[in-house]
Design a protein with these regions (language model features):
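Intracellular juxtamembrane helix-capping segments at the cytosolic ends
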Residues: 32, 115-128, 328-341
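Hydrophobic core of transmembrane alpha-helices in multi-pass small-molecule transporters
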Residues: 19, 100-115, 314-328
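Juxtamembrane intracellular "pre-TM" segments in multi-pass secondary transporters
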Residues: 1-8, 192-229
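C-terminal ends and interior cores of transmembrane alpha-helices
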Residues: 82-96, 298-310
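Short amphipathic helix-loop junctions that connect adjacent transmembrane helices
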Residues: 31-43, 244-259
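Helix-to-loop junctions at the C-terminal end of transmembrane segments
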Residues: 60-72, 275-287, 372
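C-terminal membrane-cytosol helix-exit motif in multi-pass small-molecule transporters
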Residues: 177-202, 393-399
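Helix-loop-helix hairpin linking two adjacent transmembrane segments in secondary transporters
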Residues: 102, 130, 140-189
Length: 406
């Protein structure tokens, strides 16, 4: 590993940034559907709120990835947090004045910000060689554990003893705006840019980078790329659709207090990240392939159990399992996609992956909301289970892809 690259320092900073982002995400996951329904009154389209957010994230992912490859990781990530802060302010205004237009505009800005922050894993993958890449990504993602604790601790009290009304959401959204600006300031201290670190590592390993980045049509045909994308798309789509509808299920279907959503979402985010250091080492040891399908299988088990569970503690356990399965599948997919690309190609491939994954998640959130309203929780749980299980079975039948050397 070349000297003087501040890899440990940059890893710690990116982990801190993710902690702040995940704290904000815990609010969004808990109240996106609720915010949309309370402001618009469209209960039958409760999945439209998360769908707007996810569609904006998806459609901006590929341009964001290309921008990262051109301008570097840090400037783009910082811009994303500024947009996120603005989105929170606009959403807060919408809840205060009961403006559906403002809420939708805020969700769009939050979605663009979400696509940027999700691509922080590009920077994480940049800073480590292939044999340590899953662990390196895991070290950055571990910061999210603290965000899972911070989010409910900060936002939960803001909902205590409050009626379920749009006006009770204004202050939490404003608090999230301030946190996003803090994250922007923190990420600007990352030096050198992780893309430059990746280039230095390639030179140090005597790897010759291509003169120009290959087109996406060529990159996706490389060994292991499509299976990794399938796992990432399925795991992300199932995870975000179930996660974003959980708040409405808990409050409206199971008739729990609004504040009870935050421990559940906190448990889910802990599942996503609490064991990430162990998961990273496990993936590097057992290989990317088994981890891709194994994570989806864990998600399927967690989803089907939602059919019978109504209590807050048990729902929290199942959402923890959903997050854990996503962690296993998504980290291994990210590592495999990073293995298959040079530093100049990595951002756009992960951006393409996030484009398809985000559109899948948006579609599933919208369809899941309709299924939930018309057919109930059982239909949502069975549908999510099948969507996780089918690709897991397909991936189990594939021969493992060779691990790239660069």
């Amino acid at each position: 590993m070349p000297e003087g690259l501040n890899i440990r320092r940059n890893t710690a900073i990116l982990a801190a940034v993710l902690a702040i982002y995940v704290a904000v995400l815990s609010l969004a996951a808990a109240v996106l559907s609720l915010t949309f329904v309370l402001v618009t009154g469209f209960r039958s389209l409760l999945g439209l709120g998360p769908a707007i957010y996810l569609a904006a994230a998806a459609l901006s992912a590929l341009p964001v990835g290309r921008a990262m490859d051109r301008f570097g990781r840090v400037p783009v990530i910082a811009t994303g947090f500024v947009l996120g802060s603005l989105g929170c302010v606009v959403t807060a205004a919408g809840t205060h004045w009961d403006s559906a237009v403002a809420v939708i505009a805020g969700f769009l800005l939050l979605g663009v910000s979400g696509s940027v922050t999700l691509l922080i894993r590009t920077a994480a993958g940049d800073m480590y060689p292939p044999e340590r890449r899953a662990r390196g990504i895991s070290l950055v993602l571990f910061g999210s554990v603290f965000g899972a604790i911070l989010g409910p601790a900060l936002f939960g009290p803001l909902f205590s003893d409050k009626d379920v009304a749009a006006s009770t959401l204004t202050v939490p959204w404003l608090a999230a705006a301030g946190m996003s600006l803090v994250a922007c300031a923190v990420v600007l201290t990352v030096r050198p840019d992780p893309k430059l670190i990746a280039e230095r590592i390639s030179v140090g390993r005597d790897e010759v980078a291509p003169a120009t980045a290959a087109p996406l049509s060529e990159i996706v045909r490389r060994p292991g790329v499509l299976p990794a994308m399938l796992a990432a798309i399925a795991s992300f789509g199932v995870m975000v659709s179930v996660m974003n509808l959980t708040g409405y299920v808990v409050v409206d279907h199971h008739h729990h207090a609004q504040g009870s959503v935050f421990p559940i979402i906190g448990a889910h985010v802990l599942g996503m990240y609490a064991l990430v250091l162990v998961i990273g080492r496990l993936i590097d040891r057992i290989g990317r392939g088994p981890a891709l399908g194994g994570g989806l299988a864990v998600m399927a088990v967690s989803c089907i159990a939602l059919t019978w569970v109504e209590s807050v503690p048990l729902i929290a356990v199942l959402l923890f399992g959903l997050g854990l399965g996503w962690n296993l599948s998504f980290v291994s997919a990210t590592a495999q996609l990073a293995d298959a690309t040079s530093p100049a190609e990595r951002g756009k491939l992960l951006g393409l992956n996030d484009l398809v994954a985000g559109l899948t998640g948006a579609s599933l959130a919208l369809l899941g909301g309709i299924a939930l309203d018309v057919l109930g929780v059982t239909a949502l749980a069975i549908g999510a289970t099948l969507l996780a299980l089918a690709p897991a079975i397909f991936l189990a039948r594939l021969r493992p892809a060779p691990q790239a050397a660069g």
